[in-house]
């Protein structure tokens, strides 16, 4: 075995050769540079930001959002798009389902005029477009809606009854192999929305599985299971859904946390409702019977009235959000000037 000084010299020569061939920073000691904090994109719900552990969705990573139909998957993704744009970012939406509603997206705060939208014909085209946009280095977030709608070209060109075993899984596997490095280098967040299917003949455990094979499960840094748990009513009229999100996988913080928030029809995630829930949990808002009180000031009787008070008094909502985030040590702060990202060390 070579002596320690010789080994160190050999290693330095090898590292110099690698940097000469592949560029500076292609190999380094982890302690050589200060670790950058994980940059995030807020989700629009403070409860979900807290459950994610770092204050939002991590930049430069693959995110999977899945759940039953009409559970709020696309709404969560569009709120992330709106927050990325509010911080000055560029967003793209690959609409493989051909179901994006621009008017609804606008109500959630998405700048539809600057949003890049593609409605591809095939799965290959969708993923190639996403890959090219990511490699441009100019994108902050891209949403692929949905994995189930990424139909391989061979399946489209074939007959209706033809069997195409594993084509979509191979397509996803190849695309994610190509994308992962580019996402990290460009700091782009890729959100894949996915659907649920039932496995046949499962006797024990959950029969539910997601489409597109196993590659996305491995490459995703965060996987979120979105479920509608209750219908919100104003008298007899349904006005929204109570939604529960479980973080089933998290590479940047401890997983298996849950968040609950309200999604209101035509308005999306209720930021004010989420602030009331978290404010009560953290002791900033006092709940006495049906009345909600903040620092001696009555917000209203019943959650709906308290929500409307915060909606009309944005400075109070911002103050409550700031206190919650400071206490829990997470994420970005929303001010009158928009979303101010606050990267979090982990």
Curated annotation (Swiss-Prot):
By its UniProt entry, which InterPro entries does this protein fall under?
A: AAA+_ATPase, DNA_recomb/repair_RecA, DNA_recomb/repair_RecA_CS, P-loop_NTPase, RecA-like_C, RecA-like_N, RecA_ATP-bd, RecA_C_sf
Main localization is cytoplasm
Q: Does the keyword rRNA-binding apply?
A: no
Q: Where in the cell is it found?
A: Cytoplasm
Coiled-coil annotated residue ranges, if any: none
By its UniProt entry, which Pfam families does this protein fall under?
A: RecA, RecA_C
Q: What Gene3D superfamilies does this protein map onto?
A: P-loop containing nucleotide triphosphate hydrolases
Gene Ontology, cellular component aspect: cytosol
Provide the alphabetized UniProt keywords: ATP-binding, Cytoplasm, DNA damage, DNA recombination, DNA repair, DNA-binding, Nucleotide-binding, SOS response
Example of a GO MF term? single-stranded DNA binding
The GO biological-process annotations, alphabetized, read as: DNA recombination; DNA repair; SOS response
Binding site residues for ATP: 67-74
Family per record: Belongs to the RecA family.
Query: What HAMAP family does its record include?
Result: RecA
Describe the function of this protein.
Can catalyze the hydrolysis of ATP in the presence of single-stranded DNA, the ATP-dependent uptake of single-stranded DNA by duplex DNA, and the ATP-dependent hybridization of homologous single-stranded DNAs. It interacts with LexA causing its activation and leading to its autocatalytic cleavage.
> In its UniProt entry, what is this protein called?
Protein RecA
The organism named in the record is Mycobacterium marinum (strain ATCC BAA-535 / M)
The opening ranks of the lineage are: Bacteria, Bacillati, Actinomycetota, Actinomycetes, Mycobacteriales
Gene name, per UniProt, is: recA
């Amino acid at each position: 075995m070579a002596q320690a000084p010789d080994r160190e010299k050999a290693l330095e020569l090898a590292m110099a050769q690698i940097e000469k061939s592949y560029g500076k920073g292609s190999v380094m000691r982890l302690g050589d540079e200060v670790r950058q904090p994980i940059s995030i994109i807020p989700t629009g719900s403070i409860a979900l930001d807290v459950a994610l552990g770092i204050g939002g969705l991590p930049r430069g990573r693959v995110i999977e959002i899945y759940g039953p139909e009409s559970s709020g998957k696309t709404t969560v993704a569009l709120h992330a798009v709106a927050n990325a744009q509010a911080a000055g970012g560029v967003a793209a939406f690959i609409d493989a389902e051909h179901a994006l509603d621009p008017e609804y997206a606008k109500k959630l705060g998405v700048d539809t005029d600057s949003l890049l939208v593609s409605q591809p014909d095939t799965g290959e085209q969708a993923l190639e477009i996403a890959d090219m946009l990511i490699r441009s280095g100019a994108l902050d977030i891209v949403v692929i809606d949905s994995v189930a709608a990424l139909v391989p070209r061979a399946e489209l060109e074939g007959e209706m009854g033809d069997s195409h075993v594993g084509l979509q899984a191979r397509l996803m596997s190849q695309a994610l192999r190509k994308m992962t490095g580019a996402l990290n280098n460009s700091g782009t967040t890729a959100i894949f929305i996915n659907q649920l299917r039932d496995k046949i003949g499962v006797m024990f455990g959950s029969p539910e599985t997601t489409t597109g094979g196993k590659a996305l499960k491995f490459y995703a840094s965060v996987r979120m299971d979105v479920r509608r748990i209750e219908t919100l009513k104003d008298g007899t009229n349904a006005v929204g859904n109570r939604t529960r999100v479980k973080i089933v996988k998290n590479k940047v913080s401890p997983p298996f946390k849950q968040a609950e928030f309200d999604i209101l029809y035509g308005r999306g995630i209720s930021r004010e409702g989420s602030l009331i829930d978290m404010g009560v949990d953290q002791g900033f808002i006092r709940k006495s019977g049906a009345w909600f009180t903040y620092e001696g000031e009555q917000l209203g009787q019943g959650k709906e009235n308290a929500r409307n008070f915060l909606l009309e008094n944005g400075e109070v909502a911002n103050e409550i959000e700031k206190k919650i985030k400071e206490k829990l040590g997470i994420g970005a702060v929303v001010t009158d000037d928009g979303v101010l990202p606050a990267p979090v060390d982990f």
